[in-house]
């Protein structure tokens, strides 16, 4: 009996160990599955392609072989690019890695041929377009908006501040110091007694930024007497820094985090970041004098009401498009709307890279436009047709 009891005890032990091992394997399976689902949400470099390659077609069946496309640039574009990277690997087996380093740094990496393509909010200036004429193609791939996020504990959820371009310019010039300044209250009479007598912390980008270029171009267009052309660009000597009330953050990610953790601050980011971090966004007084919140509809209204003349080739000069998109007419138009662009060369020495770029361009202008991250809108059909011309323009050559 004791021998049988010992055998039974051992058998029971083995069964229990097997159950534990099975439970561990199941747990590891679901952990791995969760990692696969969440891959690509990094705010620096998408890793989705490395996780999902097993689901893609064999490399030998693809004209681009095992090439991985590399890109860098606008953090404005990054959340959408990470989603596209994940989906491209999953659906067609094309690996795309994107670094969210800011438009300025991304341009530098592109022109130094460190990466295959760049992401940028503003298009090339006329001078740069002339310098690279016939050699660089510009493709607007999403419609986005720059929004003002803020952290004012006294403003209850469900209520929103409104800011005019003059007020924003004066805040970043350091000339409006407190949240209860009369010039802010004039735009927000319903918040009299709510907005506190607290100093405004003006958060801005610390890196070379396309988002900064878009915001400052808007301020100069809407309030030229307050915000001069000398304060427009990728990097700005912020007057508010000189009076000790300005704080820099790297990337849209950095600005978002500074505002989120700093009471009585405000900053500017792409709408997707505000949505993800659940930060309140200000309504902006538009060209018709109406306070408008950033929504899909008000951004779409801005695009439709824009007077921008669209070039007919990716090789054309796009430098006039952004100024014409900012502060458009229309009572329901949101005033700070922009394309975000991808820059690619017309000629690459590696045929596999050219084939990969052709598929990349085809996909993001077709299937990719149906996979928009909240905070972005698809490009128009007219823009899509122009972008697709780049597929035929790409060539193999050079060294």
What are the functions of these language-model segments?
Residues 18-24:
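Hydrophobic core
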Residues 11-17, 29-38, 52-53, 57-399:
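Flexible loop/hinge segments at secondary-structure junctions
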Residues 41-53:
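Juxtamembrane proline-rich low-complexity "stalk" or linker regions positioned immediately after a signal peptide
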Residues 1-8:
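N-terminal Lys/Arg-rich, disordered targeting/topogenic segments
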